[in-house]
A protein has these predicted regions:
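Secondary-structure boundary elements
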Residues: 51-57, 92-97, 184-185
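Signature of the catalytic double-stranded beta-helix
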Residues: 2-83
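Catalytic core of non-heme Fe(II) oxygenases with the double-stranded beta-helix
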Residues: 66-148
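Short, charged, solvent-exposed linker or helix-capping segments at domain edges/interfaces
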Residues: 45, 99-102, 187-190
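Catalytic core of Fe(II)/2-oxoglutarate
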Residues: 119-202
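Short beta-strand-to-loop capping motifs
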Residues: 11-14, 91, 177-181
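Polar/charged alpha-helical tracts
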Residues: 43-51, 115, 132, 190-194
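A structural signal for short, well-ordered beta-strand segments and their strand-loop junctions
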Residues: 58-60, 86-90, 99-102, 154-156, ...
């Protein structure tokens, strides 16, 4: 049986508070992305990461996905395919999912050069890549894995992934922390499985 290299749930000793900046629904679009300032981070989570000699990047984003099939497009979070990992917290319906994809033979990635206005206007010096990502069209991909995200989760964001919210009434908010090691490099999924072996589960 193939090892799941996409997702794990996490058991944490606290319930992460929902950022107060998540106070507006954006149901006129499929999805909405915004920068989440440090003042909205949960300090208990930051202290918990320190126990593992880890820390969040200074770039943290929030995503809103509308009801009735809203979702992020298929993309990854790095300039090339990789196995970098984020920790996500999600508030919303118990049916919304994250899906992971693999490009079909003969298909090509699209290079995404985002404007990232929501990050640049914060006047910070990003400590991670925000300049280039990969995107793909669903018809050119095979679905590899899908999981309901309803509790804190390790998310492999180096692989192609997207979100889907089938709920008819409730939107989905996510806070995504980019996890860095003490040398400021991005934590890899395999490393995360070892580090969080006592609190990660499928």
């Amino acid at each position: 049986m193939n090892k799941n290299m996409y997702h794990r749930y996490l058991t944490l000793p606290f319930e992460h508070s929902m950022p107060k900046c998540y106070n507006t629904e954006h149901n006129d679009v499929d999805y909405h992305v915004q920068f989440v300032q440090k003042e909205w981070w949960d300090l208990r989570f930051i202290e918990w990461l320190k126990n593992y000699q880890l820390k969040p990047s200074n770039v943290s984003e929030g995503f809103y996905v509308r009801p009735n099939g809203g979702g992020l497009p298929i993309h990854n979070d790095s300039a090339v395919l990789s196995n970098i990992v984020n920790i996500n917290f999600t508030w919303g319906p118990p049916t919304s999912t994250t899906r992971w994809w693999q490009l079909k033979n003969g298909s090509s990635y699209e290079i995404e050069l985002p404007e990232n206005t929501h990050i640049i206007e914060q006047k910070i010096n990003p400590d991670v890549n925000i300049k280039q990502y990969l995107r793909a069209r669903e018809e050119e991909c095979d679905l590899m894995y899908e999981q309901v995200i309803h509790t804190p989760s390790l998310i492999n964001v180096g692989q192609l992934h997207n979100t889907h919210n089938p709920d008819t009434k409730m939107g989905r908010w996510t806070l995504s922390y980019i996890i860095l090691k003490s040398d400021n490099t991005h934590l890899q999924f395999e490393e995360a499985l070892k580090i969080f072996k006592d609190v990660a589960y499928e």
